[in-house]
């Protein structure tokens, strides 16, 4: 019980801290389509990935719900990072190009994502798989589709999972006091 309360407190603390940081970091913020986010049901947010670590922070800052994040498995290498990232609701996924010896863990990770959706939780995934500052959508990987379809299949296609596309456009994500546009 105490452990769960600490986990919630850590997540909430960083959620508030990062919301404030995003509002300071970006000068002009245009947020559109928040009304497209359904309430009271599981949602998979599927976003482009132009700003690396900034992207999940930005989406979380303008979304009024607790979110879980699919993240690069290589980031979970040491014990502290693994502990800390889990407190921030990050879920590792392994890529055959970087960690072929760990790719087998993805089945259990996908099952965990299915359970999140069954419990009404929401998830952010970046199907491009990598981040690069470009003003175009790059080739997408199959993970988002596999997780969405797998979640529904596990629930006889009655889960009601909503997929909300998210478009992120930065004037320059690396520079302070630049502009951001988020379209839900």
Give residue ranges: language-model regions.
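Short, positively charged and aromatic/hydrophobic N-terminal segments
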Residues: 1-5
């Amino acid at each position: 019980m105490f452990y769960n309360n600490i986990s919630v407190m850590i997540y909430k603390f960083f959620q508030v801290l990062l919301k404030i940081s995003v509002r300071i970091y970006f000068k002009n913020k245009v947020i559109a389509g928040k009304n497209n986010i359904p309430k009271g049901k599981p949602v998979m947010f599927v976003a482009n990935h132009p700003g690396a670590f900034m992207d999940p922070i930005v989406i979380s800052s303008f979304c009024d719900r607790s979110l879980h994040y699919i993240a690069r498995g290589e980031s979970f290498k040491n014990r502290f990072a693994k502990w800390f990232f889990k407190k921030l609701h990050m879920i590792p996924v392994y890529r055959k190009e970087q960690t072929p010896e760990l790719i087998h863990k993805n089945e259990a990770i996908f099952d965990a994502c299915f359970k999140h959706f069954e419990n009404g939780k929401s998830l952010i995934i970046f199907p491009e798989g990598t981040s690069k500052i470009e003003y175009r959508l790059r080739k997408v990987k199959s993970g988002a589709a596999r997780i969405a379809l797998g979640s529904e299949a596990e629930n006889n296609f009655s889960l009601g999972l909503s997929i909300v596309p998210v478009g992120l456009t930065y004037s320059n994500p690396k520079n302070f006091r630049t502009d951001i546009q988020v379209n839900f």
